[in-house]
Swiss-Prot record:
Active site as annotated: 134 (nucleophile), 162 (charge relay system), 227 (charge relay system)
Disulfide pattern: 4-87, 173-178, 216-225, 242-266, 243-291, 259-264
Gene Ontology biological process terms from the UniProt entry: killing of cells of another organism; lipid catabolic process
InterPro entries noted in UniProt: AB_hydrolase_fold, Allerg_PlipaseA1, Lipase, TAG_lipase
A single MF term (Gene Ontology): phospholipase A1 activity
Gene3D superfamilies: alpha/beta hydrolase
Task performed by this protein: Catalyzes the hydrolysis of phosphatidylcholine with phospholipase A1 activity. May act as an allergen and induce hemolytic activity.
Protein name, UniProt field: Phospholipase A1
């Protein structure tokens, strides 16, 4: 049998709200035990965060991201923890293939939870946003396809944090995260070795040309560090308005200081309020908080 099986019991929802940060684990069956799910309706926007291969919801970078979202936006965060199906007990890349095949199933699971939120708790699809890292970005895409099959509206937004490249780069839309999976799909590219290179969203941000993130040191850790840096960048962009500004790739010689709201786009939860779409180059500093805007807000 598979070393990293998928079943509904191997995926847990870690529900984090401003009032309750216990990071308790829930399944579809036990959701109703959470205070938030004892109510008739959930009135706050919901964010699903999904991790990648060999990871889990309790990794420090995800906890930082959850905290930033709770503090900056009045949202309710649901983290899909599929560590078993993501093979976090094994490191062999042999298991990557299994984790890849599990992404569609975990996506379907998130779609099922979404339907429950909409039908039982009066949540509007316009208030649901998905954020996924690596394989979790494709999980979010599959969830986006599934909710449409369930005859629900599209999700308002999917944010793909360095979506996994291996096994996905050459796939067509139906087999990976795609811009039709939500009303707005925002992608942050940070690693060519582990991340997808092609543009697959409404906006694709190529931080430091989408590879070798500054401050990530030497190979082989450089690639792993660059790949996970996408999570850190998003966290900083939630904490600090316009922390990272993207310049249209066709005008990459342009300076951040000459950026206007019409042309450039700020990475983060407000990206979709900017008119421009396409591929953007994002220069970046080499130390936290990595912001490139020098205090400028567009």
């Amino acid at each position: 049998g598979s070393k990293c099986p998928f079943s509904d019991d191997t995926v847990a929802m870690v529900i984090v709200t401003r009032e309750n940060r216990n990071r308790d684990f829930y399944t579809l069956q036990t959701l109703r035990n959470h205070d938030e799910f004892k109510k008739k309706a959930i009135t706050r926007p919901v964010v699903f965060i999904t991790h990648g291969f060999t990871s889990s919801a309790t990794v420090e970078s995800f906890v930082d991201l959850q905290t930033a979202i709770l503090e900056x936006x009045x949202x309710k965060v649901t983290v899909s923890d599929w560590r078993v199906a993501a093979c976090n007990r094994t490191t062999g890349l042999l298991y990557y293939v299994t984790a890849v095949s599990n992404t569609r199933l975990v996506g379907r699971y998130i779609a099922t939870v979404t339907k429950k939120l909409v039908t039982d708790y009066n949540v509007s699809m316009a208030d649901i946003r998905l954020i996924g890292h690596s394989l979790g970005a494709h999980v979010s895409g599959f969830a986006g396809k599934e909710v449409q099959k369930l005859k629900l509206e599209k999700y308002s937004e999917i944010i793909g944090l360095d979506p996994a490249g291996p096994s996905f780069e050459s796939n067509d839309c139906a087999e990976r995260l795609c811009k039709t999976d939500a009303h707005y799909v925002q992608i942050i590219h940070t690693s060519k070795k582990f991340g997808i290179e092609k543009s697959i969203g409404h906006v694709d941000f190529y931080v430091n040309q989408g590879n070798n993130q500054p401050g990530c040191g030497i190979i082989p850790l450089k690639d792993v560090c660059s790949h996970s840096r996408a999570i850190t960048y998003m966290t900083e962009c939630i904490k600090r308005e316009c922390c990272l500004i993207g310049i249209p790739q066709s005008k990459s010689s342009k300076s951040i200081s000459s950026c206007t709201r019409q042309e450039c786009v700020c990475v983060g939860l407000k990206a979709k309020s900017y008119p421009n779409t396409g591929s953007f180059y994002v220069p970046v500093e080499s130390t936290a908080p990595f912001c490139n805007n020098k205090g400028k807000i567009i």
